[in-house]
Amino acid sequence: QKKDKKDRFYGLM
């Protein structure tokens, strides 16, 4: 399961 750009973006929030 790879993380998408959005996934990483939300991870920062």
Curated annotation (Swiss-Prot):
Residues with PTM Methionine amide: 13
Classification via InterPro entries: Tachy_Neuro_lke_CS
Modified residues (Pyrrolidone carboxylic acid): 1
Compartment(s) of residence: Secreted
Annotated keywords: Amidation, Pyrrolidone carboxylic acid, Secreted
Keyword Secreted attached: yes
A GO cellular component annotation in the UniProt record: extracellular region
Primary localization: secreted
Tissues/organs with expression: Expressed by the venom gland.
Family: Belongs to the tachykinin family.
Name this polypeptide is given: Tachykinin-like peptide-XIII
Lineage: Eukaryota, Metazoa, Ecdysozoa, Arthropoda, Chelicerata
